[in-house]
Amino acid sequence: ERELQSLLTKKSNWQEFAAILNQNKITVLYHFTEKANINSIKRYKGLFSWYYCDLNNIAIPFPGGDINSRKLDKRYNLHDFVRLSFCEDHPMQHRLKTEGKNLVLLKVKVDVAFFENTSFSDINAADSGHNHGNELEDLKRVNFDATRKRFVRKEDPDFKFHQAEILVKTWIPIDYITNINDF
């Protein structure tokens, strides 16, 4: 518990991160999940990385990603991060819905971006061409105009940039999920 709490320490220059998000009108972050996962999120009081869940025998009813995405997470040392997006209409979300998944969109306070170990990726962090890190320059690499676009098609030059990510180390406490009680 104490170890988890230590992950909530803010970056020393967190106000600079807040200024960039504010300049770009980012007021909420998003995480989509299968509706069947909501009870588990409530029970364990937050969103946890799949790696943390594995280590602590927390069963995820419908885990996101597959074997390949987990291999990529490990390759890029991102296996202990919870993925968030700047956009409400992530292309992966659309694909999963067409496959019949019952998804819900969780809204997360931007404050998680200020945690010391939170990183930012300019595109989907599973993409071999991504750049990620936890410095201000990494956040500045995000193409916020692309993240604000709606229903971006694969042919659009902003398709990859639309999928920029916020990578929160290990967990997001339930108090940061503003709409959890809507489900």
Model regions and ranges:
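Active-site-proximal loop/hinge segments that shape catalytic or ion-binding/gating pockets
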Residues: 2-183
